C-alpha cells in the first residue's frame, strides 16, 4: 500500500496546510470524542495520565488497541488525536492516549518533563499496555512522540514484536538537529517557536517552583529559540550535556536501520518543521520500514475534501496500513 496524499487546491503551501488543519479543519463528523482518564504511577514515583476513548458500545476483548503518543505540547485534545479517535471508533478498535509528563493539564511531581528521545518512557508504557491487552497493539507517534517511538523500536530490535504489532511515526523530526534549526529560523521562529515557547516557558517555571534552583530562570525567560530553551531546561533535566548532545543522541534516524517490527515513517516533503533533505531514504532504514513522503501535507496537516475540508484521510491511510502490515 502506498498513500500519495495531495493537498486540495484551496489549501496551498506547507504553512497553510499545517495551521489550517490544527485550527479550522473538521476533526470528526459525529460527536466530539469523550475520554476516560486513568492515572498511572511511574517507575520513578511520578505519574502519567492515560486517556481512553469512551466506547459507545462494548468491544470484544481481543479488539485491536490503538496507542497514540502525542507531539510537542500535545494531548488527547489535539486535532490529530480527535481525528484518529473517530477513525479507530469506526473500525471497532480501542484507543489510548498516554500523556507525556506534565501534558495532561496537571504538572507532574518529579524534577523532569518529557523529551523527543524518551524511549524509556515509551518502553514502560507499552509494556504495561501489553500486559493488560491480549489483542493486537498498534502504536502511532505524532511529531515528537513519533521520534521517541521510533527510537524505542530501534533500541528494541526483534523484541519490539513481542510488544506491538506495528509502529507508525507521523511528521516526526527523526533528525532533531535539522528540524530544530529549521523551527528556529525565519518565519518558523516567528510563528512556531514563539507558539511553543509561550506554553513551554510557563510550564518550566512551574517546575522551578517545585524545585528551586533547578535551572536559571533568567536564562530560561531570555530563551527565544527552541535551541536556547533546550539548553537551559530540556537537555540538563534529562541527562544531556546540552542541546547539541540532546538533539544528536535523541534522534531516531540512525536507529531506523535496526527496526525489526513493521514500521511506517510518514513525512510530508513540504513540512515547515522538517527539511526534506533531512528525511530518511530507503537505504538508511531496515527492510521492515516503509517510507511515505508525499509532496504536500505540511506538519501533521493532511486536510482533504471540499472546503472547509476534514482530517479523515490521514488517519484512514495510517490505520489501513496497520491492518495490512501490523
Describe the predicted segments one by one.
Residues 232-255:
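Active-site nucleophile elbow and catalytic-triad environment of alpha/beta-hydrolase enzymes
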Residues 133-237:
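Alpha/beta-hydrolase-fold enzymes
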Residues 295-326:
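Catalytic active-site module of serine/aspartate enzymes centered on a nucleophile-bearing elbow/loop
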Residues 14-59, 303-305, 309:
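N-terminal cap/lid segment of alpha/beta-hydrolase-fold proteins
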Residues 112-132:
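Alpha/beta-hydrolase active-site loop
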Residues 269-290, 294:
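Conserved loop-alpha-helix segment in the C-terminal half of the alpha/beta-hydrolase fold
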Residues 259, 265-267, 271:
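Short beta-strand/loop motif that positions the catalytic acidic residue
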Residues 53-109, 124, 128, 276:
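Short, surface-exposed "cap/lid" segments of acyl-processing enzymes
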Amino acid at each position: 500500500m502506498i498513500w500519495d496524499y495531495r493537498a486540495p487546491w484551496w489549501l496551498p503551501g506547507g504553512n497553510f496546510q499545517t495551521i489550517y488543519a490544527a485550527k479550522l479543519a473538521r476533526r470528526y463528523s459525529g460527536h466530539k470524542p469523550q475520554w476516560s482518564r486513568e492515572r498511572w504511577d511511574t517507575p520513578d514515583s511520578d505519574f502519567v495520565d492515560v486517556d481512553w476513548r469512551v466506547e459507545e458500545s462494548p468491544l470484544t476483548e481481543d479488539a485491536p488497541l490503538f496507542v497514540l503518543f502525542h507531539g510537542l505540547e500535545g494531548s488527547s485534545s489535539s486535532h490529530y488525536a480527535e481525528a484518529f479517535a473517530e477513525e479507530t471508533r469506526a473500525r471497532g478498535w480501542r484507543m489510548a492516549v498516554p500523556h507525556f509528563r506534565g501534558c495532561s493539564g496537571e504538572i507532574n511531581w518529579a524534577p523532569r518533563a518529557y523529551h523527543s528521545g524518551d524511549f524509556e518512557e515509551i518502553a514502560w508504557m507499552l509494556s504495561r499496555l501489553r500486559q493488560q491487552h491480549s489483542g493486537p497493539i498498534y502504536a502511532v507517534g505524532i511529531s515528537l512522540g513519533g521520534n521517541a517511538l521510533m527510537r524505542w523500536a530501534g533500541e528494541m530490535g526483534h523484541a519490539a514484536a513481542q510488544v506491538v504489532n506495528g509502529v507508525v511515526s507521523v511528521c516526526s523530526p527523526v533528525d532533531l538537529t535539522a528540524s530544530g534549526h529549521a523551527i528556529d529560523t525565519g518565519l518558523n521562529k516567528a510563528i512556531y517557536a514563539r507558539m511553543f515557547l509561550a506554553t513551554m516557558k510557563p510550564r518550566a517555571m512551574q517546575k522551578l517552583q517545585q524545585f528551586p534552583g533547578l535551572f536559571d530562570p533568567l536564562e530560561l525567560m531570555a530563551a527565544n529559540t527552541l535551541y536556547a530553551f533546550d539548553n537551559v531546561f530540556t537537555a540538563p533535566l534529562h541527562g544531556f550535556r546540552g542541546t547539541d548532545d540532546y538533539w544528536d543522541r535523541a534522534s531516531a534516524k540512525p536507529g531506523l536501520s535496526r527496526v525489526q517490527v513493521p514500521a511506517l515513517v510518514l513525512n510530508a516533503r513540504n513540512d515547515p518543521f522538517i527539511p526534506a533533505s533531512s528525511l530518511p531514504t530507503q537505504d538508511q532504514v531496515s527492510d521492515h520500514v516503509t517510507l511515505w513522503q508525499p509532496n504536500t501535507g505540511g506538519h501533521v496537516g493532511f486536510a482533504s475534501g471540499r472546503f472547509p475540508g476534514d482530517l479523515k484521510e490521514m488517519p484512514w491511510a495510517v490505520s489501513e496500513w496497520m491492518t495490512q502490515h501490523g
